[in-house]
């Protein structure tokens, strides 16, 4: 019995252990399946939320195309291009997915959100491909021309400086929740015991000045701030959220004054004269894997705070001319040209010279112009080219300069392929951007002492320097230029005097109006005004004119924007540390008291206003603090912004493998020629001006301070003539269809490197080498890529049908849906389908036919009754009249009267002919 009892107990224990083991294993399996399904569900839910918000945004924009509000206009022109948009959408889906999981996290253990789960979320959301390093090509071409995306400039860090990567952080960001919420998001959050002042209050009390009160710069021309804006658009664009509606709840950001991501509205004071309590503001897109997304990587909430993305290459590479992605570059190039030209406008000329081509988007209309005749915006490497005529003029100058250079290079080197001529011209244009910026522009901004301290002489490429544009530079320091924008656009005649037919214009009358350039004199009057009229001087107490603080992007009476408030709010959105933190970063003393602040600002009244608003010196927004500082000697910035701008410019120069002064980028002789060139020379070669100042940025009087274009030095392009002997065994082949090649040397041998146009895939050898027997392989071919076959990352939204075309694809909508502004999503147009109109028309015809038939039947019946009561003679007469009237256009009634020789009597019966 004891043995049986012991065996029974043993069996029970073993059974219990096995049962518990089974239960635990099953729980792990079940929980694993539950977590996986939960992740998939969270991502699917988030994708629906984000896409629904984006869809509603595009639908609202479609309905409001006639009159855009300033906020809509700003949002539209900060829309990311295709690649940037895909990254922004993926980041928003990933961030929303993690928010969904955080809200439901009580159902799961905290440690369940592992790196594996996060990898799954990154993959399902579409973020993962944009977080991996790109593959760098290993060809001689990779060392000859910079890639359009900026990737692989640094071979060890291929994403440094590339487009669609996160802005660099020189100091950790400050977010109210530690990783994502902007400064000022929570109204009860205190900084050193005080809430931050509303940005609109800061603008009104410290920044804004009337147009009449501005002081003009006695040293520098209006070209100085315009060049600064142009260069800023070459190196930085922070895309806004792809949606202007909240992801949770879908409320329109223009209709809410609550903080609901991505809505972060600018609150207006209670005594504001406007009809709304806030101005719309949309948060910048997060970079993939940061903010709420980064909060769960390793479960370290502060390990990877929210970062913002730069949609452009960081490098000074003339991306304003060529774009920062293959898709944009494809739109800009003239693929039918054998000389590697850029596309030009086919509808308008400027005294025989080219304008920028038109984009598909319509800009602000000329008064009284119907929508169908609205002038489109200009198409350039940067989407903001049409903001103001001066900016469009500079873009146009460089379009013309590229085509001038490419044509000359092709004439000098007839054996060059179209792609070689294009790349060589692009290389020179990029070098000229670097020279004009670093030699002529930046020293005037920093002053000689700060330039020597922070930039200094060039000592060669340094692969340890990260050239990525920093958040503080893009979001604060380089926005100093907004305080130098003049409220007037001055257009001058050939004598550089006020143009009688082209009067001065206020800025509000030129925003996004390219028709003013085309229909009102072309480039020359604008360029003369930039050269011969002064910039606005940045003066404490006169920081920004009211055209920018009260009338920004105003096209109608449907609202306004305030650029100063936008700058301050953007800094808080990006979590920029305060003014004193950045002074300490630059080795400058912290300023804690009004007396200390007055040493840097040197304006007691402004210091008092700052302290009244901010209450504590460590609360001051960095953009305001840097802007308010007194200038350094010979500079146009104070010490803080001189430090930040100088450090950034040095990084852009020293961290760029393709910097024009770097060894092997150009020959020694070519570098000497490049140094001769200047912005005035570019103006001489590409406008109708015959006299220019030697320095385009210095204000001068005409004619004594202007030189003849014949005396302005220029490059000798003969230095680009290729003289290497071409072996008869290796004659340059014909260019491949839908592709091109460039040539270079590798180990002393001639090499051809082939590439296909965007939308085509290379099949065969990418690189062909010249040997003793000729080319070592046949040229490759370029095959069309069927983008529609990609089911993993479909190019069109599910609402659209994908149609493959040669080198591209089209997203097609069924009536009454139309493509949204992303050209991938079908939006309900709000009108009846064409088929419905056809049905209505057919129905109307059917009803009309039935009515006519009914009328004829009734008339016949009535006529038959009348025939029975008429005398024989009357009946015969009437029918006779009807027969006579046929074919002559005479009414039967009148014909009957003619037969009797009488006019028809009033009120007599009119008989119907059969």
Swiss-Prot record:
Residues in compartment: Extracellular: 32-834
Disulfide bond sites: 136-152, 253-263, 257-278, 586-643, 684-709, 730-770, 756-782, 788-802, 796-811, 813-826
Residues that span the membrane, as ranges: 835-859
UniProt cross-references to InterPro entries, sorted A to Z: EGF-like_Ca-bd_dom, EGF-like_dom, EGF-type_Asp/Asn_hydroxyl_site, EGF_Ca-bd_CS, Haem_peroxidase_animal, Haem_peroxidase_sf, Haem_peroxidase_sf_animal, NOTCH1_EGF-like
Catalysed reactions, semicolon-separated: 2 iodide + H2O2 + 2 H(+) = diiodine + 2 H2O; [thyroglobulin]-L-tyrosine + iodide + H2O2 + H(+) = [thyroglobulin]-3-iodo-L-tyrosine + 2 H2O; [thyroglobulin]-3-iodo-L-tyrosine + iodide + H2O2 + H(+) = [thyroglobulin]-3,5-diiodo-L-tyrosine + 2 H2O; 2 [thyroglobulin]-3,5-diiodo-L-tyrosine + H2O2 = [thyroglobulin]-L-thyroxine + [thyroglobulin]-dehydroalanine + 2 H2O
GO molecular function, a single term: calcium ion binding
PTM description: Heme is covalently bound through a H(2)O(2)-dependent autocatalytic process. Heme insertion is important for the delivery of protein at the cell surface. Cleaved in its N-terminal part.
Catalytic residues (positions): 233 (proton acceptor)
Compartments reported by the entry: Membrane
Cofactor(s) it depends on: Ca(2+); heme b
Textual note on the cofactor: Binds 1 Ca(2+) ion per heterodimer.
UniProt protein name: Thyroid peroxidase
Gene name, Swiss-Prot/TrEMBL: Tpo
